[in-house]
């Protein structure tokens, strides 16, 4: 994110802050070079469970700066600015720099704030997997395993191409709402913005995001969401258990029982699908999420 970082040797005690950073390091086979991880919205990928068990979990939520330092890290890779950005309550990059600990922030999340309403930043163009490929490539170079990075990128590119090829072109594009979570049924809903990972998923499936805002995580009332009239509602499954509506079954129960939302065509047509919430962040999980949604929509005949 505009910061130059130089390495004279590969890190030996890396801390992965945020699920995406941790899972990329694990996919690169670097569990023996990791001192700890923190901030996991959902469970680790099943194929990484064994490797992940070898790495200390600091917390599934935001860690403290002291907890990170107690692991004596020689490198910190972060998935989100909220973990090491200028407004982070955990630590700022300069806090690590003062201690001569190099840091890396995911290029997918280098966002600008465009006003007080864009709490999590905004994007003026659609996110693509290219940012993720850059991250995998750069992390693999930092750890001197560039060949593993290229193999992983090739695998993701093949999956993306296969997914696009599996969805036939149609004149009628499905429109999607991606509901991450809400503090309560009466509170505004946190949604995936049109140019973030959710917008990418809609695009790769030949559709569009019904929420037309550049904000990364717009919080909207249900009146506005109902007015957007999506063809499909994608509800996030989260393992963090911060709010009751983190659970997909709680979201579905609300959508089908509330007098207003139950009248939405998407609800009446049973066009509610469940997706791993981490896929709504621009991460390696995004392609998994797109595959999840495609499978459910095909099973219901909503895409051929």
Outline where the language-model segments fall.
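Alpha-helical, coiled-coil/dimerization segments enriched in small aliphatic residues
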Residues: 42-44, 54, 190-217
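Bacterial Sec-exported substrate-binding components of ABC uptake systems
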Residues: 1-23, 125, 138-179, 298-304
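Short helix-initiation/N-cap motifs at beta->coil->alpha
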Residues: 2, 55-66, 214-222
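Solvent-exposed loop/turn segments at secondary-structure junctions
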Residues: 20-23, 40-43, 63, 75-76, ...
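Short helices/loops that flank or line small-molecule/ion binding pockets
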Residues: 65-73, 91, 220-229
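Flexible loop/hinge segments that line or gate small-molecule binding clefts
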Residues: 92-138
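A short, structured surface patch at a secondary-structure boundary
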Residues: 16-86
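Structured C-terminal subdomain patch of bacterial secreted/periplasmic proteins
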Residues: 123-135, 234-304
């Amino acid at each position: 994110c505009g910061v130059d970082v130089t390495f004279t040797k590969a890190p030996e005690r890396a801390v992965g802050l945020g699920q995406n950073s941790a899972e990329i390091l694990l996919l690169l086979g670097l569990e023996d070079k990791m001192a700890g991880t923190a901030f996991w919205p959902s469970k680790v990928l099943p194929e990484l469970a064994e490797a992940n068990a070898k790495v200390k979990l600091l917390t599934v939520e935001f860690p403290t700066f002291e907890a990170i330092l107690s692991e004596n890290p020689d490198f910190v890779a972060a998935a989100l600015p909220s973990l090491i950005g200028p407004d982070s309550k955990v630590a700022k990059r300069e806090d690590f720099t003062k201690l001569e600990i190099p840091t890396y922030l995911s290029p997918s999340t280098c966002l600008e704030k465009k006003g007080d309403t864009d709490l999590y930043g905004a994007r003026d163009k659609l996110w693509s997997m290219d940012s993720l490929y850059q991250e995998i490539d750069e992390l693999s170079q930092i750890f001197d395993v560039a060949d593993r990075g290229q193999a992983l990128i090739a695998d993701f590119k093949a999956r993306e191409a296969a997914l696009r090829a599996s969805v036939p072109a149609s004149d009628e594009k499905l429109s999607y709402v991606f509901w991450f979570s809400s503090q309560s049924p009466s509170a505004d809903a946190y949604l995936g913005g049109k140019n973030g990972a959710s917008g990418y998923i809609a695009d790769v499936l030949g559709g569009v995001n019904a929420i037309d805002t550049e904000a990364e995580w717009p919080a909207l009332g249900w009146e506005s969401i109902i007015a957007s009239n999506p063809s499909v509602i994608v509800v996030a499954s989260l393992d963090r258990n911060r709010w009751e509506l983190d659970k997909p079954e709680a979201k579905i129960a609300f959508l089908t029982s509330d007098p207003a939302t139950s009248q939405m065509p998407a609800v009446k047509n049973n066009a509610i699908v469940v997706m791993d919430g981490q896929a709504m962040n621009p991460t390696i999980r995004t392609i998994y999420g797109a595959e999840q949604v495609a499978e459910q929509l095909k099973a219901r005949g909503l895409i051929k």
